[in-house]
Amino acid sequence: MYEFLDRRYALALYEVGEKNQKLEEYINDFGEIVHLLKNDENINQVVNHPQISTSEKKKIFMEIFKGKIDEKLLNFLLLLLEKKRIHDAEGILTQLNKISLEKHNKVVAEVRTVIPLTDNEKTTLASKLSAKYNKIIIFKEIIDKTIIGGVYVRVGDDVIDGTIKFKLESMKKVMLKEE
């Protein structure tokens, strides 16, 4: 349910950013703001304090961010405060990034390996995934020693598990079934 609302807010911010040709700036600045909301104790105290009114919170946000971020992005933050949706900022950022990828015909492929892929392996994997999904592939590489060997790829909800760990677990299940 909240994902739907997050997407609506994200789409509104995306459209404003695109219209003003500041989309990348909005994504980067909003990402930093989300990081602050999660990690800055002072901002957390202000946002979560029940005795600080919404109008006071808005004034504080104006003092913190005015002149440091685009005015339309600041207005977006103030709207989130007013609608009591500031706690959804991380979900909105996630949806904003998804929308940006969709609009630019890109998709993120999470790739887990024991050792980093070579440039040749990345190129080969990117071309195969690009052909399958008909999108530009952006790699999110993760080094994971627990997979023992092979490669694990996740694109959206699709998983391609060619890891030794998976093969060993599959063999174990087959062997235990036969007993």
Curated annotation (Swiss-Prot):
Assembly and oligomerization: F-type ATPases have 2 components, F(1) - the catalytic core - and F(0) - the membrane proton channel. F(1) has five subunits: alpha(3), beta(3), gamma(1), delta(1), epsilon(1). F(0) has three main subunits: a(1), b(2) and c(10-14). The alpha and beta chains form an alternating ring which encloses part of the gamma chain. F(1) is attached to F(0) by a central stalk formed by the gamma and epsilon chains, while a peripheral stalk is formed by the delta and b chains.
Q: Identify the PROSITE patterns for this entry.
A: ATPASE_DELTA
The name on file for this protein is: ATP synthase subunit delta
Subcellular location per the Swiss-Prot or TrEMBL entry: Cell membrane
Q: What does this protein do?
A: F(1)F(0) ATP synthase produces ATP from ADP in the presence of a proton or sodium gradient. F-type ATPases consist of two structural domains, F(1) containing the extramembraneous catalytic core and F(0) containing the membrane proton channel, linked together by a central stalk and a peripheral stalk. During catalysis, ATP synthesis in the catalytic domain of F(1) is coupled via a rotary mechanism of the central stalk subunits to proton translocation.
**Cellular component aspect of the GO annotation:** plasma membrane; proton-transporting ATP synthase complex
**One MF term from GO for this chain?**
proton-transporting ATP synthase activity, rotational mechanism
